[in-house]
Amino acid sequence: MIHELKILPEYFDAVCLREKTFELRKNDRGFKVGDYLYLKEWDGEKYTGREVTRYVNYILYDWTGGLQDGWCIMNLKTSHLKATLDQTRGEQDE
């Protein structure tokens, strides 16, 4: 499954630079290992046009040390899904 999510600029940059390889989110979408996060930079008022896709390869659903119920931490890996999606869209337009 592909989840389209907003992300603030300071976090977006860190994800793009591979400095931030995790995402803490309310698990209101039923995130699962094997999903993709389609992260779209949001400046608080509008989308900036920058976007990146990451693959979810591990999820921590509960942690007695402080993760609240209904939240999860996802480990992110680089993904080439967006390039594949763009290529597929281009082929459909022909």
Language-model-detected regions and their locations in the chain:
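Catalytic phosphate/metal-binding cores of nucleic-acid and nucleotide-processing enzymes, i.e., regions
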Residues: M1-Q87, E94
